[in-house]
Amino acid sequence: MEEEGVKEGGQRPRSAQTADKAGWIKKSSGGFLGLWKDRYLLLCQAQLLVYENEDEQKCVETVELGSYEKCQDLRALLKRKHRFILLRSPGNKVSDIKFQAPSGEEKESWIKALNEGINRGKNKAFDEVKVDKSCVLEHVTRDRVRRDQRRRPPTRVHLKEVANAASDGLSRLDLDVPDSGPPVLAPSNDVDAAQPRETPRPPMPPAKPSPAPETSSAGDRMETPVGQSAPAPVPASSEAHPGSQEDLETPVVEDSDSEQPPNRILPDKLKVSWENPSPEEAPDSESAEPPQVPGAETSEAGPREGGKPPTPPPKILSEKLKASMSGMEASGPAQSPGASEASAPGPAEVSVNGVDDSPEPLQSSQAAGPPGTPPKAATTSTTLPPWDLQPQLHPRCSSLGDLLGEGPRRRRQPGEQLHRAQLEVKVASEKTEKLLNKVLGGESASVNAETLLSQAVEQLRQATQVLQEIRDLEEMNREAPGLREKRRELVTLYRRSVP
């Protein structure tokens, strides 16, 4: 510490030894005509003690430096006087204090010491830690009454309740049994109810056989329920014609394991004699009874449920076909026999998807013959025409090119239209079978046979025309070879770009 302000003859007291700074400084008494008096100053931490002499017997003033902002040099008129001032901080009611040092070095040392004291006074609240004994934190559970024994463990009943609430029917803990073995998971009622719905045999993996076995297997599937559901007895009239009994026999497709029952044999009334049947292929059956069609559809849908997803139901017939069919039904009874013969199309128009071209000669011969003569026997088959096999519109898997090609410009519509047209042709053939059964059975004797026959032929012709238009549209919508090459290049570029 500096002792320049202390008088030469005196010794420094003990309190001055513990002070930060001590010395003689002139202090202004304040007022307009302030008097400067010599005072002995002691700087202790954040307090400035003012004494009249070094004995420190009488303390004139105690200054709290925390109430002041700073200590700086005082610009006086006479620069030869080394004066400095303590500036109060705003909000305090203390007055500014002016000091005068004996030299410039003493003034600078006092300014520095007083500024340090001011900082200590400002930070006094942060440096000191006050502990208030009245604000003792109380423990949360300290006031709880202590028992002689600890808390008892949870009972088995409580554990059982918790297990029942947590398991929620998934896994139940058997707490009643003392052995507590592995739990037995009993199936619920929903699982038992759902078991009969499952198919008895799992679907076989898809194979790639030749088209001929597929046709034969499909024939087996369709022939089995038809033959088992309603086996018709052989009429007495068939016994009288042993020659025609041989014609009624149809070849039965045999599996490697078991033989299938023979097809349903129709009575003589429902048999249609076909002129010039083709020796290579058996003529398709258009004179089958209407109850056979739903049976065939159910037998066809049965095996498909196990292996493939069910196809969507057939859509409503088109407006064009509806209008044409209603128009023909309205104008059919009014037509003359000559007009029906003139409107009958040629063999090229009647053939649809490989259907035999022989209905027209049959119909003309039936109309020309006398009503009393019984029709000749002919071979019949319950196999459905090729349009019964619905095309698979949705492939099971698709390549990357197909995935990139799908979008707003995908061409799935022509295939759907083709399937829809095939269903329309199928409906027309069923109606034709109904009309032929009416004519041959003699149910409607008042209605002219030629009129009904002309209606059936016209319906077949319209269905064939719609099917041909849709096929032409599908050929027009085929993608160009350049577009396919472009798609392949895009797939190659995508595969190369994938890290």
UniProtKB/Swiss-Prot annotation:
Single Gene Ontology BP annotation: macrophage apoptotic process
InterPro entries linked: PH-like_dom_sf, PH_domain, PKHO1/2
Composition bias, Low complexity: 229-238, 329-349, 367-386
UniProt biased composition (Acidic residues): 246-258
Phosphoserine: residues bearing it: 167, 237-238, 273, 399
Stored PANTHER family: PH DOMAIN-CONTAINING PROTEIN, PLECKSTRIN HOMOLOGY DOMAIN-CONTAINING FAMILY O MEMBER 2
Protein name as it appears in the record: Pleckstrin homology domain-containing family O member 2
Taxonomic lineage of the native organism: Eukaryota, Metazoa, Chordata, Craniata, Vertebrata
